[in-house]
Amino acid sequence: MSLGVALAAQNLVVAADADLEPLPLKLPIPAFMGTPTDMPLGPHVEPPSDKPRAPFMAPKGVKNVAEGKKVTSSDKNPITGELSLVTDGDKESNDNSFVELHRRTQWVQVDLEKRYKIHAIVLWHAHNTWQVYHDVIVQVSDDPDFIEGVKTLYNNDIDNSSGQGIGKDKEYFEDYQGR
């Protein structure tokens, strides 16, 4: 598991729809080259698209509040990289741009240090190889122990193998656009 994350947020009053604009995301260079030989499709896998995804709409002036913030993880000794790479803003797929966690259910937690109204969460797994990402769960909470007030925003765990409930979101092919 390798990833990076961007959280766009502000701590202002909710803006009117007229004040929304596309979230300014600087996407990394597409890293996967070639044609995949095995495309595992099925009812739980979102087919890959050759079109750009629709922009996230957010109030003017939002910023990445996760950038540079402290990251903790269930994996205390990543295979490659440091946990700080999760929030350093670098979304490229070269060897110095990501942290790789050991295979098994893992989590990362970003401490935003204060409460924000979050408008978008964008994350990147490794996007230099063709693979489907399973059991991706995004949760937020004001509780640092994630015991109370936990809200699940995304869950594609179709069999509850991560123990966080069965998700309704689809598994997906990672690409340079993130998720």
Where are these regions (language model features)?
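Bacterial N-terminal signal peptides
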Residues: 1-10
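Predominantly extracellular/luminal regions of secreted and cell-surface proteins
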Residues: 54, 58-90
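Trp- and acidic/polar-enriched beta-sheet ligand-binding modules for extracellular glycan
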Residues: 17-34, 74-76, 98-107, 115-116, ...
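N-terminal pre-domain segments of enzymes
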Residues: 12-62
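Eukaryotic beta-rich interaction modules
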Residues: 89-94, 102-104
